[in-house]
Amino acid sequence: MLSKSITRSLKQQVTKKSLSKAIAPSIARSLATSTPPSPSDGLKPSHVYTKLSHTDDPARSRFFQYSWGSWLKDDALKKKQRETIFSIEGLTAYLNSVDSLRVPETAKLLQPKEEQGTFVLQNNLTFDVLGAKSDVLLIKSISSIHEGKHHRIYKLTLSTGKDLVLRIPYKLESDTAIASKIKSEVATSDFLKLKLGLDVPKIIAYGPDRNNAIRSPFILQEFIEGELLMKKWNPLEPDSDKTDEDLKSVIAPIAEFQDKILEPVFTKFGSLYFYNDVTTELQQNGEPYEGENDEKLLKRWRVGPSVEKAFTKGKNKLSQDVIDQYNGPWDASNPEQVMTSVAEIEIENARNKLAIVDADAGDVTSKDLLQHQITTFEHLKQITPKLLNSKSPSIKNVEELFKPRLYVPDLDPLNVIQSTEGKNYFIDFEGSTIKPFILSSYPKFVEYQGAKIYDLKVDIPGFDEMDPVEKQQYEFMYYKTRNERLWEVELNKHRHDLIAVASPHIKVLKSPYLQALDLKHSKDYLYVEGAIVQLQSMWEAYVANELVKQDKDDKEFPIKYDEKYLDQYQLDLSDHQMETVSSPFSATGGWIPQDMFRTLKEQGILVEVGEGNYEIKTDKILENPPSETGEEPKA
C-alpha cells in the first residue's frame, strides 16, 4: 500500500501547479539542486554469497549492480554507468602483496610506491589499519555498504580482524577525469593528515585507472567504525533551545574543520597532487605553500590542474587537450582567471556539442538550447573580470579573501563519521580545489540562495491566516535562512578576517560564477543569466563603491540587454521553474529511492513506457488521496 506521506507529496505536486509568485523564484533553484536523500536502512541490497574461487558465479553480477534507486528516464543506461565491476580474485592477491610492503612505523616518510599499476602509501600500512603482520593476509568477506552519487563503497573484512574500505568510482566521466580526481583526492587527504594533523582515514593505496590487478580505478583506505553526523541533523525543526543546540552540534565541528583547512596559503590556484603525479614542469614550480621547514614534507605535494567539477562534469565530449587549456593551475596574482576559465570551458563545451548536432552525429540536444547556452556563457566571460575588485577598499580584508586557500566542496554531515572513540573523522575530498575564499560557496547542507526570511510573522504579513501548504513553503524558507545564519555565526567566530563573504553584496556579485559551477540540468544556464541580470540594477552603486573592477567614471553595465531578450529570458526561466516545482522527482534528477519506486509501480502510479523510461500516472494519484483523518488510503 502506498504510504500517506508519499501519496500526499505526489498529489500536492500534481494538483498545485504553481507556487505563489513570492515563493517560486526563490525556492525553485533550491529544489532543483537539492541532494537526493540517502536510502533508508530498508533499502540495503540483499546479500550475495559467492566463493572467491568461483569466478563464473552468475550471482556475482548482482554484487556490482546499482540497486539503491531508479530513474524515470534512461534507467538502464544510468544503472549501467554505476556498475562497479572489479576482480575479487585480483583484489585478494593485490592486498596480500601490499601487506608485504610494510615498513617500520619509525621509517622515514616515503613517496607513494608504484606497485602493479597502483600506488601504495607504505607509511600507512600500520597495525591499527591492517592488524598484525602474518604470512598471508586474507579477505574473509566483502560487503557493499553504500551506493552514493559518485562512488560505491565496499567493506573488506580481513583475516586479522581489521576492516578496510574499497571505494570504486562510477563511470560518469572520462577515464582521465576519474584518474585526476583520484590522484588529487588522495594527495589532499594526505596533506590534511600530515601537514594539518586532521582526523581523516588513512589511505593505503590507490589506482587511478583500471590497469591493475583489481581492474578498476579505486581508493583503498582505513575503515572508521561509528555513526554519521548526519543522524543528528534536523534542518527543518521548529525553533527551540534544544533545536538551536542540536543544529550547532552539527555545524560547529564542520566549521572548525574548515577553519583548519583555511590556515595554509598556497602559491597557486589549482588542486593538490603528489609530487610524482604532476608533470616535470609543474614539479619545478616549487612548494605548494611557503615556509615549510619540515624536511620530510618537502617535494611531497605540488599544485596541478584543478579538478573542480566545472572541468570534469559533463565534459566527456571534449578532448583532454582542450580541457587542459582551461583547468590551470593559475598564478596567485591572477584570481580572475579562476572565474574566467569556468566561462571559457562552458563556451567550448556548448560549441563542441553544437558542432556535433550540425554534423548530425547522433546528439539529440536542441540546437537552439545550445545557442542560448553559448550566449549566456559569453555574457559570463564578458562580466567575470569585473565581478569582484581584488583591490577594493570597500571589502574588509580583501587581500586575505583573494589568497589561494583550500576549498573542500563536500563538507557535509554525511561525510563526517563520529567514531566510537569520540573523534569526528572527515571523508570524501573529491573535487577539492585551491581558490580564493571569496569565490567559495557555503557547504550545501546550510547554503541557501533564495529570498531570506528572518521572522515569519514580521516578514510575511498574514502568515497566521495562510493554509498549511502555503505556511510550509514559507517555513522552509525561514529554516533555510536560519541554518545559513548559524553557519555564518560560526565562520565569524573562527575567521572574523574572512567574514566579508557573508555580505549580501558579495553573494550577489559572485552568484553568476557559483551558478555556473552548479549546473545540473541543460536549462540551468538560465540561473547563470538570471544572476547576471540581477546585477544590472545595482551596478552603478557597485562601481561607485569600487566593489567591482570597473573605472569609476564608467557606470555602464558590461552586458547590453534589449527588452526582447529579457522578455524571452523571463519566459524561459518561468517555464523552467514551473517544470521544476510541478514535476515529481525533478529535484532529484528523476531519481527515486528503490523501495518507493517499487511501491509506485505496484500501485500503477509508475508505468514503464519503454527503453528504460517511466512516467507518472497522475490520475492514479488523484484516485487514491491520503485520508485527512490520518488513515492510510484504501486500496
From Swiss-Prot:
Location relative to the cell: Mitochondrion
Biased composition range(s): Polar residues: 1-17
Presence of the UniProt keyword Cell cycle in the record: no
A single GO cellular-component term on record: mitochondrion
Assigned keywords, A-Z: Mitochondrion, Transit peptide
Transit peptide start and end: 1-71
Chief location of this protein within or outside the cell: mitochondrion
Entry's family note: Belongs to the AIM9 family.
Protein's UniProt name: Altered inheritance of mitochondria protein 9, mitochondrial
Organism field: Lodderomyces elongisporus (strain ATCC 11503 / CBS 2605 / JCM 1781 / NBRC 1676 / NRRL YB-4239) (Yeast)
Name of encoding gene: AIM9
